[in-house]
A protein has these predicted regions:
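Glycan-recognition and catalytic regions of carbohydrate-active enzymes
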Residues: 133-180
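Active-site neighborhood of glycoside hydrolase catalytic domains
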Residues: 1-119, 123, 127-144
Length: 180
């Protein structure tokens, strides 16, 4: 970031869990390994935020495993899962929103599950911080125009989506549809 000061965004992507669950330094305190790991991570993040206080950072949480309220001191948002299938994201986002507000969650429109319409994929991603991971050149003109309008609508509705009250009406776990 020092070499490229124009960087506008930082993603902490750490999808590998600790696999060798032993530390020769902890000796009889092996049960402290995960706690000490997180404390060490936060020390690293303290240094990054001290050096780059205005740099937005996203935590890629690998399925929610590293999302916690302490992390919000450092990260502006969480990426809850690399699974961007919009049907699966309904379940992921439903569960994530039980603990964290919409403004902390990112969801992107992708090409996963092309059997669903661009409208459905966009509607699901608009439930939180909307993004697109999709090649515009691969989209039909009508889908592209729809996305342009959807972004305009999202920007208009963003204060309600990110800061409004969320009411859960129908769980995706109890039926073949959901509503929030």
């Amino acid at each position: 970031m020092t070499k490229y000061p124009g960087i506008a965004f930082f993603k902490w992507d750490c999808n590998s869990p600790i696999t060798n669950i032993y530390s020769m330094y902890l000796k009889e305190n092996q049960s402290h390994l995960y706690i000490d790991y997180v404390r060490g991570l936060y020390k690293v993040l303290d240094r990054i935020k001290a050096k780059y206080p205005d740099l937005p950072m996203m935590l890629c949480s690998g399925g929610g495993g590293r999302s916690d309220y302490e992390a919000l001191k450092y990260f502006t948002e969480f990426w809850p899962s690399d699974n961007t299938d919009p049907i699966e994201r309904l379940f992921i986002q439903w569960g994530f929103s039980q603990v964290f507000p919409s403004k902390t969650l990112c969801a992107h429109v992708t090409t996963w599950n092309r059997g669903t319409s661009i409208k459905f994929r966009t509607d699901v991603a608009m439930m939180c911080k909307l993004g697109f991971d999709i090649k515009l050149d691969d989209m039909s003109q009508s889908d592209h125009l729809y996305c342009v309008q959807a972004v305009k609508n999202y920007n208009r509705l963003k204060p309600v989506i990110l800061d409004g009250d969320l009411y859960r009406l129908v769980s995706p776990y109890g039926s073949n549809h959901t509503s929030s």
